[in-house]
Amino acid sequence: MTNMRKSHPLIKIINHSFIDLPAPSNISAWWNFGSLLGVCLTLQIITGLFLAMHYTADTTTAFSSVTHICRDVNYGWLIRYTXANGASMFFILLYFHIGRGIYYGSYTFMETWNIGVLLLLLVMATAFMGYVLPWGQMSFWGATVITNLLSAIPYIGFTLVEWIWGGFSVDKATLTRFFALHFILPFIITATAAIHLLFLHETGSNNPSGLNSDSDKIPFHPYYTIKDILGLLIMLMVLLTLILFSPDLLGDPDNYTPANPLNTPPHIKPEWYFLFAYAILRSIPNKLGGVLALAFSIVILALFPALHMSKQRSMSFRPMSQCLLWALVANLIILTWIGGQPVEHPFIMIGQLASISYFCIILILMPTTSLMENKMLKW
């Protein structure tokens, strides 16, 4: 009699994905982030579901309902802060996951990579709409500023903005639709992540050497299940430390003031994980130019397969490219810092220089360095 896990139509899928999956024997801890993102997404859906049971998507009661969740619902504060800080954790893991993909040349799996870029955009949209829901000052003004960017689109811009708002300003209709979309998007993300995994399993995982590992595979379970559980415990420890000791560390104090359309906060800024893109947006004096730079700063990830000029897949044996990648990481940290600063000297200049160098590193320096490394190795 065959093992049920190998014959049952449903269990067979799980078996081929997480148990008997042949995995390279040399993948490092950098390959843990995919499973951690899956856990994070599950956590977000569960906490979000419980929050939705108590939240009201109405401008007059939204802020009070969040207060009610924190004060009156059993462990409501825990659920609320897990959903808020879980989003931050999600982005930390996501940025590590993307960085790993760039370092080890995983973007050469075109379908997997492009679906990954789509996933990033979906997660960003979900996080943005979630930030609007508590209906604090930063929620309201963040929604106003970011949706208003679409008015830079020629001809249809203003119509599009009013269509998204459901009126002539960010109001009840906007909040209701943002809540509906914020609820449905994580399920769309789950389905997209399943497709992401499907395409990955067509080719098998990449590995630190960037070489074909078909001749040296080991079963996913128990080797990588145990390894992933270690990563999971570390992640949960970091997340719980954040939630239980400083839940508002990554938030904005302005969001504890109910939304007031008549009073603009002194510094409107998004959550920390969008600050790098926000800095690029602000560094260009022209509105349409800024919006295009903002969009391109994220969509540029889709160009990585086309910009890969090296004869080697991974950066493991390419020290010059490694230096450039770390320069890019430092550059993104500078952009994140600048995004949270007021628009004044010297921050404007630093932001503009960091924005230029961001695009230069990716579009010019990295491909050129790859070609140079090929030459040095006489390839």
Curated annotation (Swiss-Prot):
Cofactor annotation comment: Binds 2 heme b groups non-covalently.
Keywords for this protein: Electron transport, Heme, Iron, Membrane, Metal-binding, Mitochondrion, Mitochondrion inner membrane, Respiratory chain, Transmembrane, Transmembrane helix, Transport, Ubiquinone
Localization per Swiss-Prot or TrEMBL: Mitochondrion inner membrane
Necessary cofactors: heme b
GO terms assigned for molecular function: metal ion binding; ubiquinol-cytochrome-c reductase activity
SUPFAM superfamilies: a domain/subunit of cytochrome bc1 complex (Ubiquinol-cytochrome c reductase), Transmembrane di-heme cytochromes
Binding site for a ubiquinone: H201
Regions crossing the membrane: 33-53, 77-98, 113-133, 178-198, 226-246, 288-308, 320-340, 347-367
Binding residues annotated for heme b b562, in chain numbering: X83, H182
Bilayer topology term: Multi-pass membrane protein
Main location as per UniProt: mitochondrion
Record GO cellular component, one term: respiratory chain complex III
Alphabetized InterPro entries for the sequence: Cyt_b/b6_C, Cyt_b/b6_C_sf, Cyt_b/b6_N, Cytb/b6-like_sf, Cytochrome_b, Cytochrome_b_C_euk/bac, Cytochrome_b_N_euk/bac, Di-haem_cyt_TM
Coiled coil in keyword set: no
UniProt GO BP: mitochondrial electron transport, ubiquinol to cytochrome c
Job description of the protein: Component of the ubiquinol-cytochrome c reductase complex (complex III or cytochrome b-c1 complex) that is part of the mitochondrial respiratory chain. The b-c1 complex mediates electron transfer from ubiquinol to cytochrome c. Contributes to the generation of a proton gradient across the mitochondrial membrane that is then used for ATP synthesis.
Assembly notes: The cytochrome bc1 complex contains 11 subunits: 3 respiratory subunits (MT-CYB, CYC1 and UQCRFS1), 2 core proteins (UQCRC1 and UQCRC2) and 6 low-molecular weight proteins (UQCRH/QCR6, UQCRB/QCR7, UQCRQ/QCR8, UQCR10/QCR9, UQCR11/QCR10 and a cleavage product of UQCRFS1). This cytochrome bc1 complex then forms a dimer.
Family classification: Belongs to the cytochrome b family.
The protein's name in its UniProt record: Cytochrome b
Taxonomic source organism: Trinomys iheringi (Ihering's Atlantic spiny rat)
Species classification: Eukaryota, Metazoa, Chordata, Craniata, Vertebrata
This protein's encoding gene: MT-CYB
